[in-house]
Amino acid sequence: MNIIGLTHKESGCGYHRVILPLAFMDNIKGYVTNFITEDKTDDWDILVYNRICQYDINWNKTKELLGCKVVMDIDDHWDLPYNHINYQSYQDMGKRIETNISEADLVTVTNQALLNKVKQFTDKAVIMPNALPYGINQFTDIKVESDKVRLFWCGSVSHENDIKILREPLKRLTGNIQMVMGGYNDSDPLTKSIWDRMFSMFAGKHPS
């Protein structure tokens, strides 16, 4: 089976929901790109992408060009609260996502709650839980011994409000604790400022 995946290098969702599954799936030919060149339009059985892609303007034309089934993955809810960093952009994107759900030959989701939401638009949906290939490459468990109890959180700047929820409860923790955060990104001033706020809220009085 030949599967082409669409994502871009800065997408964490694309990495975990498109790239990793294709990298570790048995008995397939997988290819991942952010743009399908003319020489890569033939011989595909499945096109898979997360949420949106540049070819979702006209699905009839895209399916005719590639001649394959389309699998859309959606790993989180697209109806965002007003205080979410991506709220404004998703006001326009929501309808696009719902159209993509309806047009897909199959939709994969991460959990039952999301499946229930997606089934409002299609009955061709299944749960594919998040997973990591533990024991391989960067996912090898190399534990550094410590006398501290380490609390680990990993995510992106889109979770700033989630960290705010944790801020006060974390202040009540006592003992020999070390706070560890993963995903830090200082690629631009805005992203860095959000991460610095998140780190301050998460670590609080505890060493990091």
Q: PLM features: residue spans?
A:
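N-terminal pre-catalytic "stem/leader" segment of glycosyltransferase-like enzymes
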Residues: 1-54
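Conserved catalytic-core segment of nucleotide-activated headgroup transferases in glycan assembly
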Residues: 5, 9-27, 133-208
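Short, well-ordered alpha-helix to beta-strand connector turns
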Residues: 43-46, 67-68, 74, 103-105, ...
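An aromatic- and histidine-rich active-site surface loop
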Residues: 49-66, 163-165
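Alpha-helix capping/helix-boundary segments
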Residues: 53-54, 113-115, 186-187
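Active-site proximal beta-strand in glycosyltransferases
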Residues: 63-81
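Membrane-proximal helix-turn-helix segments that form the acceptor-binding/catalytic region
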Residues: 88-107
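Donor nucleotide-sugar binding/catalytic pocket of nucleotide-sugar-dependent glycosyltransferases
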Residues: 103-140, 150
